[in-house]
Amino acid sequence: MQNTNTIIKKLDMYIPAAKIFQVLPSEENAIFLDSSLVNELGHYSIIGRKPYLKLEKREDRFYINDTEETSISFENYLRSYLDKQKTANSSHLPLASGALGYFSYEYGRRLMGIPSSHKDTISIPDAVLIFYDAFIIEDCHKKESYLITNGITEPADILLKKLEDAILKTSDSEPVKPVKEKYPIQVHANFEKEDYKKSISDMIHYIYEGDIYIANMTQQLTIESKKAPQDVFYNLRKNNPSPFGGYLDFDHYQIVCASPERFLKLTDGHVETRPIKGTRKRGETEKEDLRLRKELENSEKDKSELLMIVDLERNDLNKICRSGSVKVTDLFTIEEYATVFHLVSGIEGDLADEKNFADLLMATFPGGSITGAPKYRAMEVIDELEHGKRNLYTGSIGYLSLDGNCDFNIAIRTVLHVDGHYHLGVGGGITAESETEFEYEETLQKAKAILDALQ
């Protein structure tokens, strides 16, 4: 079905989405998905405006526009809604109608039926999807700006005119420059260093016992900083650009993301996932940079780690894809970011007939790169050895189009601001060859860009 009310307009003037988001009057449930690193992965930036439907999962409860729904589950409602509301997108843009939002790691844990031994210390929904009437989309490759309205909250032409007028007014506005003032921060980890190293040793013991082959071990940092979340976001996107970043502003919490990792992209029934395993910091000189890149390229430990996750992701996709369609398209690729190198693989397949995003999510979430193999047992070990719940960290943030397509990241390099504190998870994959000191130091390297942005 094609929504005949939908209007898509290319603006005569190119205005970056980051500037528009910064200077437009804020709205409740504001979400900005940001491709600040423009490459083959970072192509579009998306702003949602005029929300009309909010789906939330809070533990075992499901809410539609803040009203509890008891007659159907979140997953079944989403599956049914996507089937009933399926709408063609005739444009080249990633979506013309649909939702932006997130799924937390805790959503995935409950989806897998794994109980937690930890108390809730942070109160946010496990999953949020917000369907918007209007979108502002930047084609970061072509440097073009688009407005889309669907005529749900008010006539599409009227809403388009309002948005266009508001945006054109911003073209003369100077965007607020990233804050240069340095803020003191205090960082509190939920592990002492030696305790974290012991948990890694315990995880390695489980590997030798045959319980697991690989698992992801993380620690949680709580940071006290007076810097505003939106200032953190704009500093982070400037100094550590990423293809899958974002800023999500909800009632009592905000999410700042600079993820380099794609979890799921679904395009006309074709599924892609790109797990990351293997990290090296960037060098301070060109010579050191090249040495560290080569070190990662030649690391048998990191390649072995990634291969195990590739096998897991292939198995997950085979549950939901057409027989024989799942293939490894990219085995060991080095991706460069401002502070680190990553080792990445690509796995693709064709979604089985009569399946949609809800089925894909249930078959694959949470991602294998941030859990381990076998997934269920690895997640049990994670709950036993980590010192608290992960909450949003290692979940997914992205968009869901009503034409059936989607693109979701892995929520790493992601900080949650709630009740005046920032919460940051950092971790890495553990194998039989892991060295506890190296793994601990790697978590600090992964935290560096966000800790810098918080100052």
List each model region and its residues:
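Extended alpha-helical targeting/anchoring segments
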Residues: 1-455
